[in-house]
Amino acid sequence: MVDIGLSASGDSTRRKMEAFADCAVEVVPLDLYDSFRAKIAANLQWICAKAYGIDNVPEELKDPFYTDQYEQEHIKPPVIKLLLSSELYCRVCSLILKGDQVAALQGHQPVIQALSRKGIYIMESDDAPVSESDLSCCPIKMSAHMSMIDALMMAYTVEMISIEKVVASVKRFSTFSASKELPYDLEDAMVFWINKVNLKMREILEREQRIKQQVIESPSHPKVRYRRDHPSSRHLPYFPILEDLTKDISDGAALLAVIHFYCPEQMKLDDICLKEVTSMADSVYNIQLLKEFSNEYLNKCFYLTLEDMLYTPLVLKPNIMVFIAELFWWFENVKPEFVHPRDTQELKEAKIVMHPKTSRPQVPISNATKRSFLASPGSTTDSQATAASESCSSNYLQAEDAENGKGCAVFSPSHPLLPLRQKQQKSVKPEESLNHRDQANSLTRADGQPMASIIAWKEKKPRPLSQTFALHHAADDVESTSGDSISLARSISKDSLASNIVNPTPKHQSYPTPIKVLPKSLLGNVDIEDDEEELVAFIRSDDASCPGDLELQSVSSRASSQMSTSRLRRPADLESKPDSFFLEPLMPAVLKPAKEKHMVPKSEEYGEGKQKGFSSKRQNEGNQSFSRKKIINNHTGHDLNRTFTPLSSLESDPLRTDPVQLSIESGNGNFRPLATSSVESSEHGGGFFLHDLNADDDVEDKPSAGNLIMEDPHKPDTTWTVLRPGSENLDVGGCEEVAVSRPVGKYIGEEESVKLQEDLKLKEHDDKDDASGRSSPCLSTISQISSASMASGSMRMTSFAERKFQKLNSYETKSSTSSSQKTTPDGSECCPPPLTTWKQRREQSPGRQNRDHANVLASELVQLHMQLEEKRRVIEAQKKKMESLSARQRLKLGKAAFLHVVKKGKPETVAQPVKPEHGFRDYTKRTPEDIDTVSVNAKVEQYLESIDPGIVSSEVQEAFTDPKLKDPALLEADICNLMADANPEDIDSEIDVNECDLSIEKLNETISTLQQAIMKISQQQEMLMKAPSMAVPPLPSSSQDHKLKPSVQFVEPISPPGMPIVRKTTRFGQGRNARSLRVTEQKLAKEKMQSSSRVITPTNSIETVPHLKSVQPLKSPSVPTEESPVEVVPEQGSASQDKPTTGGFRLHNDNSQRTFVLSTSKDANIISEQMHREVISSSRVAGVSTSESSGKENVPVDERHKSSLIEVDLSDLKEPDEGEEESDHPEKTKDIISDDQKSGVGFFFKDEQKAEDELAKKRAAFLMKQQRKAEEARLRKRQLEAEVEQKRDDARRKAEEDRIRKDEEKARRELIKQEYLRRKQEQILEEQGLGRPKPKPKSKKTRPKSVHREESYSDSGTKYSSTPDNLSSAQSGSSLSLASGATTEAESVHSGGTPSHRVDCVDAPSGMGRHQSRNAERDWENASTASSIASVAEYSGPKLYKEPSSKSNKPLIHNAISHCCLAGKVNEAIKNSTLDELEKCDSNHYIILFRDAGCQFRALYSYYPETEEICKLTGTGPKNITKKMIDKLYKYSSDRKQFTVIPAKTMSASVDALTIHNHLWQAKRPALPKKNSLGK
């Protein structure tokens, strides 16, 4: 009797449900669910996980929200800072891009451009494109950032899944109609894949149910005792079919069914709640199950909450799509060891159930298998080939395994014992694998070695009739679907579903149990390898692992021998991989002899001892994460979190870490890095390999291991550390060595055929077209690392094409270091951007593999040019940004230092040192001449700020100012020594408090001296004003004509641009980002070289104006060009070479008349920056200008002497003097700026060696000059205000004239109208009025049409100028009035309420109105029905116009009544009655009667052209209308829904409406009914 546990796990779902119920999951109700917050949380969680790795996300980023004291949720500032800085986006985008593109990712704009090149455009919800300013603006604009993250998610999605991949996957296990079911976009492809998998699951369960029923009912079958209910009484699970991706996926059932299909062992079918109608509790349970599985096996790729999945708002659609794409990528690309698609096992179970007697349970190895091991004429080369093929086929995303001579297809066809897959690859490689490689996206296997799954997707071909199969997961397969606990091994063929039942094993007993029978023998080793390798072999690069290792050889000798012989006999059949690579016997026993012959121990093959119980443990502990398994098997002690952390140790000592860490997802349990864009399969960089390259024996000593000979097995690790995207390391050299050589290895002893080599060359280049993202660049940081490891491991070359590409691309590897593809000079960085628009994906031709190599090279060159150009722009932008940041930082520090100076030496106000990072960034962007200078400045500035700013040692000043210090290096060295002596940390201990007090006292003395000098200056004022020889030189003169000095002056006037000194002013932005003049380093360098005298010391200049770097120089008459040197001529003409000249600059606030004349010393810089900040914050600064020749000169002095600050009152100064300015380095300054805005106060520094009166003269001259400029500015401002006021007066006057003219025009129109009405009345009253109307049209033609049209406005009371009338705005509001207020001369009547579109251009401007209205009549006569009154056939009017015919105008009249004359709810009754009458009448032509030119509907008439009779059908009006009664004729335009007057008096079939003379109505006026009772 056979016990079949049909429902052994039947209550597992109940147990899990109860476990979940115990957790008491709280679900946020839908009305409290905030989809926008959920979107922010999901997007931020996703991008942080991708940027840092799921296990390395910083703690503050894991929950992006915080709650404030008012219970309001906000996004954490660190998160906002990261988003605004674009760091996250650059990190994530670098995982998608190719190598040399990654270096350019230095801001939002490069990321936007990179995505747009991939066909993904960042748009907000209102279809407005997201710009860089949207992403960097503060306060943060979250909608723009959400759009950016959505675009990155879409880029990831596109990299992981494509229509071609889905179709190829589905084709493997199902059929579909290409004309009806082919997906048209990614969303449709996802629905298509999920639905096909669910349909396949339905089919599998139904088939299993039928087979079990047959087994039970079969009379020849042994009796079966069921422990539980009969299987037929159980309902099959319901597998849902999706229609809408977001709505139908919310219960999780469809996705769990997909997971079960691929991982039946990990996701039991009985654990899934599959119901036709899913309750909320069932959905919650399924979603929790989905999340649990993702966290355990899929590297925690489920970034949504339970409510997100439950409610699936539309905004989360990209998040759901990227999760589905990741599922697809795991199951179809990476295929870790736990992936066992059900389609590979459905036939196995059927065959074993139907043929129970052909299998012998508990027989580990058959005799035939043993004979095949011993009898095979294998050689060392065979063994190498076998092992190499095994390792090759075990790597999924090793992009170019076979391409570089390393794949399975490399081996010579003369080898008699090729494995099944190897033979298949050989035969199908040129056609099928190439096609699929090109169709696949960047994450598919893009190499010459056709993955079994890829080949199987192409076509199902015949296979051997009988093949041995492993026990695999048979027990769980059956029981997971139907409750059976049968453990099945079987012999299978496509033609027969019958097989014998094997002895069942307990439900949870692992499949390798039978193998342990011969644990000590070599065959025992083989078996243990089998169970251990069962699926790991597919995804790792074990030296001896092979797909065939999966095969469990516990089968009957007949089956084994039959399979062995058939495999040798029928190689043609073996080309196919029929149902998938899972369906083929993964390795025949025949492959083992080579290994036995060499007796290679497993420990050596794997690089270390294997754990015998590993497989069993893995099966029993199905929830183990993949990373953990890898660690167990490798015995590695590495910290797996190293991948995502900056490892300086790796950078410094690359040999310290094992390359194995490259193959393992570091700390994530993630498989993504394992599926990398590697160049070689046997280097293990990207595959799941369980052995270490640092094996006991060198790789070269183990040719059977199938490894490439690598010059340095540690190199992959080196390359990985260089390429780590999160790293700040910019050292390129480490990877240049590796990348220069083509990393192509050659197997020892292998004999490549010429044909194979040619195929490989072809495939190399085709892979370059499609391999841009095969590292799953989107997937994690380690994928890039693995790719680097692949590229760097070997220095051998086997292909000339590779050498050519290496020459072409090796220099590109030096350009950037943060890309996954950088060190793989396989051309992948040059390939064109992958197609990412879905339409392009659908249209992507499979013939791309035949692309000419020249085209590839051309596209590479174009791409390279674009990338370099973009990189250049990015660097320039970054340079400007860094300079402005540095300027602002220094400005802040200057202000802090200045405040410190003026606060009587309070120690707590010491300025904070400059952050080194700003300086270092700037240094990289400068010319070599400037780098020394800037570095010196930064160090000096740090030193000066670290101590009391007033107490600068004389040594520092000497270093700054000594002209003999020509060498910046010497200056830097001296300053470094000084800084070392006065370290900021030792400030408290080194600075003497008494010295501070003395400095403050000295400052007070200086202030008192300044006050005394004020009186002297006022007394000398008259003398200074009258001194002709000391007059200031004219400002507009050239700077070369006068004595120049290197001081730079900055004038910031409040007046409008136009002062004599300023030709062009620069407007300040928002009052906060002050734009100031830039003293460029190039200019300084040039001056330093060209000037015959000592020019502005670069150190001083840069120190003086650090915050003015980012603004272009302004052009003023007195500013020399950048190319011209600035001459320095001291006043005495003495040797200026020996004395330094220090630049000073002035800050002038026009409003307060305060002027600072400052030296370039540190304190002067502080004061200037403080004043500059005050001017900016006051928002009164209008511009900036420079003046190199404003009459100010530097007098060289001994810089070691101290100087004092002198305050000068400017209120009494009136005439400037040509004084000379002396700038010295003061120790202290004090803020004595007066609050009085009227009195000007100037600061300057006096030299104690000079007479105070002489100094006063010089300073007074400059201060007076500034005051005069301020006066001129105020005068100019008053002039401008007067001009503006004059313009306003002119505008008012003009408006008044226009109004008067309009009134006159209105009166004139009224007069004309009255005259016209009078003449019209006279005409009507005449007895023979028939003959006289003929001259009327002529007179009307001579008069401009706009006159008639404009008359209408006198009735309506509206005021319009000479523009054509706008009837819609002059309506009275009556629904029956189509143009109320229009006179009888109105040319076109528009239906009520809609804008007027008249034939004669109603919207014409006033100047054009008369001319166009004059032409309107001509247009009508030339292009309308007036020319075809006699003959309708001659009509040549507008196309939209319904040409009148002799048939009928009933539809036209029907349209007019419905939509124009009687439109609206108010007129519904009269409209219906009128239309009824219209339908009843059988006449061909109808006429509408209007009351007057206002086109108010009155009646409907039928017209008989033969007799010219017009008879009333319904409405108010005469019974019959004769020719004499007709006043105006109208034509209806059905497209415009309006009537237009016809300039004719003769009735014809083209007329749709008319009016009768007014006197006819007037006679009956008392009897007229109201408008709403017209339908009589």
From Swiss-Prot:
Key microtubule-organizing protein that specifically binds the minus-end of non-centrosomal microtubules and regulates their dynamics and organization. Specifically recognizes growing microtubule minus-ends and stabilizes microtubules. Acts on free microtubule minus-ends that are not capped by microtubule-nucleating proteins or other factors and protects microtubule minus-ends from depolymerization. Belongs to the CAMSAP1 family. GO terms for cellular component: cytoplasm; microtubule; microtubule minus-end. GO terms for biological process: cytoplasmic microtubule organization; cytoskeleton organization; microtubule cytoskeleton organization; negative regulation of microtubule depolymerization; neuron projection development; regulation of cell morphogenesis; regulation of microtubule polymerization. The keyword Thylakoid does not apply. It comes from Xenopus laevis. Residues 1437-1571 form the CKK domain. Residues 1333-1346 have a biased composition (Basic residues). Transmembrane segments: none annotated. Residues 554-566, 813-824, 1116-1131, 1367-1382 have a biased composition (Low complexity). Residues 428-439, 595-611, 840-852, 1195-1204, 1225-1236, 1274-1323 have a biased composition (Basic and acidic residues). The keyword Cytoplasm applies. This is Calmodulin-regulated spectrin-associated protein 1. InterPro entries: CAMSAP (IPR032940), CAMSAP-like_CH_dom (IPR022613), CAMSAP_CC1 (IPR031372), CH_dom (IPR001715), CH_dom_sf (IPR036872), CKK_dom_sf (IPR038209), CKK_domain (IPR014797), PRC_barrel-like_sf (IPR011033). Residues 613-626, 642-651, 1178-1189, 1354-1366, 1383-1394 have a biased composition (Polar residues). Residues 415-447, 549-572, 595-653, 811-852, 1108-1149, 1178-1236, 1274-1422 are annotated as: Disordered. Its main location: cytoplasm. One of its GO terms (molecular function) is calmodulin binding. Residues 217-332 form the Calponin-homology (CH) domain.
